[in-house]
Amino acid sequence: APVAPPVAAREENMVINRELLFKGAAYWNQLCDILLVEGVGGLLCPLTETESVADLAKGLGYPLIIVIGNHLGTINHTLLTIEVAEKRGLSIAGLVINSTSPESESSASKTNPDELKQRVQYPILATVGYQLNSIRNKHEKPTGPHLFDHPFDDINWLTLTD
């Protein structure tokens, strides 16, 4: 079940090791041009019993790409996330608007990108439509609306780290 990391750790009788997270990031950072670290659950989601995802982001020092679900409440959620990031001194590279269900074709989801452009100073890097069956065996023929559109092809990822 999708739960916060400390909850999952308790369910498995494990402890999240903060230092291991940083060592792992440093290791992988040496092996690749770009390292994306998912901020599971959002910036204020608990990461350990005493720290949040925002603390991890601050410690790593990587710029944030804020991924936003495209639905009613997106504008509020985005502005709150940006406010938290800025107050904690986190660098924001931009936003990705992501549709996670076929219901994402609501009036709110259609107007969210333009409304956000008016309210935030960060670029919208991509808007991703709902991708039915996107988690499939890569050898199977894709089906469904918007499947395997490549909204990230035009992003120069290396410039986001500047």
Language-model-detected regions and their locations in the chain:
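Secondary-structure boundary/capping signal
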Residues: 11, 64, 123-124
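Short glycine-/polar-rich loops that comprise or flank the Walker A/P-loop
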Residues: 60-63, 91-92
